[in-house]
Amino acid sequence: MCLRSHFKVAFTQRKVELSKELRRSRSSRNGGLPLQEQPMGQKWGWHRGEPGHPRMEELNEWPQNGDHWSRKWPPPCAFTPG
C-alpha cells in the first residue's frame, strides 16, 4: 500500500473525528467549548467578549450558573459594611 494513500485515509478519518467533536461540543449548551475548558464555570463566554446571555437586559444579574456566579450584584444590604 503506498504511503500517500495511507496518509489520505488517516487524514480523512481524523477530519471526520474532528467534525464530530466540533458538532458535539457545539450542541452542548455551553458556549461551544467542552466543559473542561470553561474558565471558572462561566457558561456564557463573557471571557471571550460575546454578548448573548438570554437575560442581558437585567444588567445586574449574573448568568445563572453554579453558585458563585448566580448571585445578584450589587449584593443585598446585609453584606454591605456600615
Swiss-Prot record:
What are the Basic and acidic residues biased-composition ranges?
A: 47-58
The domain of life for this entry's organism is: Eukaryota
Q: Where is this region: Disordered?
A: 22-82
Where along the chain is composition biased (Pro residues)?
A: 73-82
Specify the protein name. Answer: Putative uncharacterized protein KLHL30-AS1
